Amino acid sequence: MKLLTIFALAITSALAHDTRALSAEQLKRRKLEVEARNLAARKCAPAVRAFENQRRHIRRDLKHFSLDLRGGHFGAQQEKEIKNKTCVMTPEVTEGPYFVKNELVRQNVRENQRGVPLTLDIGVIDITSCKPLPNAFVEIWHANATGFYSGFTAESTGGSGNTGAPPSNSTGSGGGNSTNTAMSDELSFLRGGWPTNKNGVVEMSTVYPGFYTGRTTHIHTAVQTNWTKAANGTIESTEGNLLHIGQVFFDESLNDKVFASIPYVNTTQSHTTYNADDSILAEENTGGYNAFADAYQVGKNLQDGVIAYITIGVDSTARYSFSTTNYWTP
């Protein structure tokens, strides 16, 4: 049996995609930081194997699992396809143009969005101690099945309700830089987060993300500790210790299968950027990094859902910050 994956999300950075913006000294420092995190994460490999193995066995045996595991299909497939790779994050961080501060504290972010059900089994491990990190707030945000982000729906051309295309007035590549794009609404679908439990694990319920012009399919992630929940049920994004911002990607074969189904086929976005073409993925998936989730179809039918395992390796001493000025105000 192959070793289990540690998927410590590679971090997105505008600087990382245009090294001309960095001085020689900055490039040298960045390389040293990457190497240090790489070494720290690899030292944690045995702990991560045990961490993921435990989660998979619990999931396999859990009778009240939210998705249908009929026929043993999931268990057999996952054991055959476990990857063997240790990965770490790059030191620079940015959230992209469609992040919104103060999102809802919730595990299920689907709201009324149609699409293939997606369960994210996310584990967070501290690479300074090789131990799971409890009570770490894990936040996700992504486009819906037809490539639209909540909060940025001004240019919606239709679609299946409460959808909007990524605004054309955003500079940059549509998700990899920190360009601040003005919000057009207060919609909140496919955004939110929840803390890890005492074992450093959190389950998030969403739908499989679609694509939009200029980017391959991805989900944004952020992790912070010492976080605060406001009285209105949102996280106070600037109050905690931000340890991580990144993006997770999916295998092209699974993307193709999902995008051939309804409502993904109804998109007006141009599917011209695949994993092999995405510059952000290229940056994140080199030098020993692994930017792909360990994802499996649940049951015999695609609409039964997909489960994806993600292990995020973070440095608990790191301190980053969000750059957007956009806030969600319920």
Go through each PLM region and give its residues.
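A signal for specific C-terminal beta-sheet/loop modules enriched in small/flexible residues
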Residues: M1, I11, E52-R55, R59, ...
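Fungal secretory targeting signals
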Residues: M1-L27
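Functionally constrained cores in energy, signaling, and assembly domains
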Residues: T5, G123, A143, T221, ...
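Short linear sequence elements within intrinsically disordered, low-complexity coil regions
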Residues: T12, E103-L104, S279
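Peripheral, solvent-exposed domain-edge segments
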Residues: H17-T86, A260-P330
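Beta-strand-dominated extracellular/periplasmic modules and repeats
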Residues: L69, H73-N275, S316-S321, Y327
